[in-house]
From Swiss-Prot:
The gene is efp. InterPro entries: Elong-fact-P_C, NA-bd_OB-fold, Rib_uL2_dom2, Transl_elong_fac_P/YeiP, Transl_elong_KOW-like, Transl_elong_P/YeiP_cen, Transl_elong_P/YeiP_CS, Transl_elongation_fac_P. Belongs to the elongation factor P family. Involved in peptide bond synthesis. Stimulates efficient translation and peptide-bond synthesis on native or reconstituted 70S ribosomes in vitro. Probably functions indirectly by altering the affinity of the ribosome for aminoacyl-tRNA, thus increasing their reactivity as acceptors for peptidyl transferase. GO terms for molecular function: translation elongation factor activity. This is Elongation factor P. It holds the Pfam family Elong-fact-P_C. It comes from Streptococcus agalactiae serotype V (strain ATCC BAA-611 / 2603 V/R).
Length: 186
């Protein structure tokens, strides 16, 4: 059992009614009067629906045991993404609504980890940084420096990242997947 105050983004727990829930955001909130509450943005792993809720810090939940298996992202068709286990060559289908954020960071043939809850495939774990190519951005301004405010750049996967002014279309960049931010040129 884990207390609500210990839940952090990325953790998965099971509710009393059997729902498998992943924490997207968690924060302590202390109103002017009264007790502290935990405000959370959560996703139902099975349905993909997201919702906001609050818990008392002492409320307890059953932490879900999630296992991971190395896999390769094959392709996306309609509303399904296809992955292949690197060891057994088994193929897995995951509804894109459950992993739409992760799909912004991976290309076909990328190495990922498939997440299992028992025998049920529930998600994808991606690396902490990835290399993506800039598909489109505003032209560079002559004399631009690193200290500028930056500009938006659309990556080859559709992800939009704020990048320094000197970045041009076609360049490979290292992107932090946890925050969706530019790290460096590749």
């Amino acid at each position: 059992m884990i207390e609500a105050s210990k839940l952090k983004a990325g953790m998965t727990f099971e509710t009393a009614d059997g729902k498998l829930i992943r924490v997207l955001e968690a924060s302590h909130h202390k109103p002017g009067k009264g007790n502290t509450i935990m405000r959370m943005k959560l996703r139902d792993v099975r349905t993909g629906s997201t919702f906001d809720t609050s818990y008392r810090p002492e409320e307890k939940f059953e932490q879900a045991i999630i296992e991971t298996v190395p896999a390769q992202y094959l392709y996306k068709m309609d509303d399904t993404a296809y992955f292949m286990n690197n060891e057994t060559y088994d193929q897995y289908e995951i509804p894109t609504v459950n992993i739409e954020n992760e799909l912004l960071y991976i290309l076909e043939n990328s190495e990922v980890k498939i997440q299992f809850y028992g025998t049920e495939v529930i998600g994808v774990q991606i690396p902490t940084t990835v290399e993506l190519t800039v598909a489109e951005t505003q032209p560079s301004i002559k004399g631009a420096t690193v200290t500028g405010s930056g500009k938006p750049a659309t990556m080859e996967t559709g992800l939009v990242v704020n990048v320094p002014d000197f970045i041009e279309a076609g360049q490979k960049l290292v992107i932090n997947t946890a925050e969706g931010t530019y790290v460096s040129r590749a």
